[in-house]
Structure formats: structure tokens, C-alpha cells
Amino acid sequence: VKIESNEGKPQHEQLITVKLPPEADYLNDETLEVYEQDKKKYDQTEQLITNDSITLLIGDYGYYDPVQDAIECSAVIVNGTKTEIKDLSFQVSIENNVMQGRVFLDNSVPELTKEQTGNFKPSMGIPVILGFPEEKPTDEIENGRKIDTKNIKINLSDIQYKVVEQEGK
């Protein structure tokens, strides 16, 4: 299934369940802490979900990494379709209202593995950390800085996934 964009698509309020991915067992403590925070923020909450598509809910972790020259932010990917899905991939672009005068490039999220999503069922969310490299890094920022994720807007495009066939259908 391929979806160009969620722009202007209808949305509905929906109760979502956030699960940590199977790979959580192997993640470093910092990443796990970010995932746990976002799980706590969104698990068992009503959220505005795009009909029959994937929705990205922005988490609380935002950081400018001077080593990578990139903004990192956490998010929860929600399956707003009516079926279990796999092999999800998409493009993300960031609207930078945080660091004026700097341009951050779009990024591709390659096919997420079963280790990253588990069984990705409808109304389920999984935490991720997204990165957006800076177009022309200047190296003038030496120290990392926290970013208020309320000022970040992320757009999804080129969403692709496969429907998991149910046994016995």
C-alpha cells in the first residue's frame, strides 16, 4: 500500500495503545528512557489519528546534536489502518520553528523491521527517534541543546507498508 501524503486527509479521535518494540531489550538506557517517556505520554490516550493511514505523534524528546549536525526528536508512529501492517517505510520532513535560519533536510525512514515494530496492529503506536540532518552545518554550535518539541511540526509523505495476511482468511 502506498500513500503519497496525509495532507488534508480526514482524522478521527481514537484510543491508542503504545507498546515498546521487541528491540527494546537491546537498546541503550538513554533511548529506552525516551521510549518510556513517550509511551507514558500517549499510551491509553485519545489522539487525533489520520483515517486509514499512519500518524506521527511528536514526543517530548528534542535535541540538536552538534556531532551529527542534526535535530533529533522522538515520536510515536500510530497504525491508523484497520489491519496489521509490516515493512513500513516513509519520508519525514520537519518544519523548523526552533532554530531560525537553519535548514534541516528531509529524511527517509527505511523499512522498519519486525524487531522495531513487533506485530503492528491497528490503533497501536510504537516509539521511534527521528533525525534531520542540517543542510549547511556551520559548526558554530559546539554544545548540544534541548529543543522544545512543541515547536516542531513533522510531515509524513511517501508512506508504504504491506498488509499482514491473517491466518485462515
Model-predicted segments: where are they?
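Short, well-ordered beta-strand segments enriched in hydrophobic/aromatic residues
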Residues: 71-79
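Short edge-strand/loop segments of extracellular domains
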Residues: 93-97, 155-158
